[in-house]
């Protein structure tokens, strides 16, 4: 029989992309007494999509742009396939997120001569909406998020691939996740 190592945590986050790292930061800030674990199939911030972002982060900051226009560009660009409630939430919270990325996480984005954030339009956008750091926006965001997470008491499981969800007794929710440690082959 294969021996399985057991670890307990209060909050388990799978993935160390932008969403995973933001989740870890928000969980730790909201409930610092809880044990938070970040599990990633590779190395923290060396895998995932966020680090590959070249374009930037879309946010309606005025100058003729609105959250409504951002939302419609998102829906039309997605050929009406996006979940509209989620798309609205994404567009509506974008100003809050860009402020958080700059003021709390420490990201630096390109600026106009007057000091305002530089924005440019990408395919399908009806306004200059994309905040960026040259063409390395993803690396800027993921690097600053990683710095913040590494400063906090968040357990990190690197090179651990989730291979099965373990349902809770009664079928309501999950009681665990089965991982394989990619370095050792152990569960």
Residue ranges and their predicted role:
Residues 3, 34-35, 40-184:
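Conserved N-terminal/central alpha/beta ligand/cofactor-binding core
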């Amino acid at each position: 029989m294969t021996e399985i190592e057991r670890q307990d945590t209060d909050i388990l986050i799978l993935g160390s992309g932008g969403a995973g790292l933001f989740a870890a930061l928000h969980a730790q800030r909201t409930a610092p007494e809880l044990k938070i674990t970040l599990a990633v199939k590779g190395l923290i911030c060396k895998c995932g999509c966020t680090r590959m972002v070249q374009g930037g982060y879309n946010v309606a900051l005025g100058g003729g742009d609105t959250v409504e226009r951002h939302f419609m560009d998102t829906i039309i660009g997605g050929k009406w396939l996006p979940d509209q409630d989620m798309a609205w939430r994404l567009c509506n919270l974008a100003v809050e997120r860009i402020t958080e990325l700059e003021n709390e996480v420490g990201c630096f984005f390109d600026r106009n001569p007057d000091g305002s954030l530089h924005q440019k339009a990408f395919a399908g956008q009806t306004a200059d909406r994309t905040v960026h750091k040259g063409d390395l926006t993803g690396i800027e965001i993921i690097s600053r998020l990683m710095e913040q997470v590494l400063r906090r008491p968040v357990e990190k499981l690197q090179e651990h691939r989730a291979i099965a969800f373990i349902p809770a007794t009664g079928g309501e929710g999950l009681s665990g996740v089965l991982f394989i440690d990619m370095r050792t082959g152990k569960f």
